[in-house]
């Protein structure tokens, strides 16, 4: 009997050790790029986010004219409209990120992320809400996610309401957060969207939206919070996640509060 009790106790201790620390969580905005030798949305920024143990690395995805998903914030890259340009042109060795890396493909980004299996991948689809574009980009996204086996790590965000609604249908087990900032949580919940990720001044104007979202079981993220005073205020308001260019500062504040 004593052996059985000891076995059960050890099992509980191991389970407790394996649990992910409770939130709030820190998301590195476009990866952790504010370090030597890195750049926004680069493979190194992803690796830096993993190195510091960030909850998630946020990144932006565009679709090229020939159907390649690439990681880049703007709709343009070195003056070229990504949606109207083939991948080979964008991947020219003369066109680099600030740290000398080439523009990453989504496949390359996912492959590099496998070294950090505990880190979430906060996927922003860059879209102007064009149905034809999203009809290609969303299925290609899901295919890439499944190909690399990272489905359990994905959280979707987008300014495109239609993309959020469709992601919620395509991958109902994943968190989908709308970025726009103008819609109350209850209305989004009715559409099947499971989170809000609003620019932080929105929550100063509508702090009640945080409680409203939580009552509906929705996730509350906020961007892009870089000053300590804002981080403290938003943590007091009760956000679940902070997206920031200063992830180590946010980590220290959260550890201090806990």
Q: Residue spans of the language-model regions?
A:
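Phosphate-group recognition and catalysis centered on beta-loop-alpha active-site segments
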Residues: 17-258
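Sec-dependent N-terminal signal peptides
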Residues: 4-13
């Amino acid at each position: 009997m004593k052996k059985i009790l000891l076995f059960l106790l050890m099992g509980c201790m191991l389970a407790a050790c394996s649990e992910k620390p409770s939130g709030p969580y820190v998301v590195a905005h476009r990866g952790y790029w504010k370090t030597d030798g890195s750049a926004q949305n680069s493979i190194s920024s992803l690796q830096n986010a993993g190195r510091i143990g960030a909850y998630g690395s946020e990144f932006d995805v565009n679709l090229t004219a020939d159907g390649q998903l690439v990681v880049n914030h703007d709709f343009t890259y070195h003056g070229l409209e990504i949606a109207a340009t083939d991948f080979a042109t964008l991947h020219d060795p003369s066109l680099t990120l600030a740290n000398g890396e080439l523009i990453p493909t989504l496949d390359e980004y996912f492959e590099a992320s496998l070294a950090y299996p505990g880190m979430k991948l906060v996927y922003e689809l860059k879209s102007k809400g064009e149905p034809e574009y999203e009809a290609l980009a969303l299925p290609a996204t899901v295919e890439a996610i499944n190909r690399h086996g990272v489905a359990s790590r994905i959280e979707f965000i987008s300014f495109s309401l239609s993309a959020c609604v469709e992601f919620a249908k395509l991958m109902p087990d994943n968190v989908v957060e709308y970025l726009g900032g103008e819609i109350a949580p209850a209305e989004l919940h009715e559409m099947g969207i499971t989170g809000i990720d609003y620019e932080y001044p929105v929550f100063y104007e509508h702090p009640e939206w945080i409680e409203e979202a939580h009552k509906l079981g929705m996730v509350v993220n906020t961007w892009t919070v870089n000053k300590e005073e804002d981080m403290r205020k938003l943590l007091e308001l009760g956000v679940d996640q902070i997206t920031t260019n200063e992830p180590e500062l946010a980590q220290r504040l959260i550890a201090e509060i806990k």
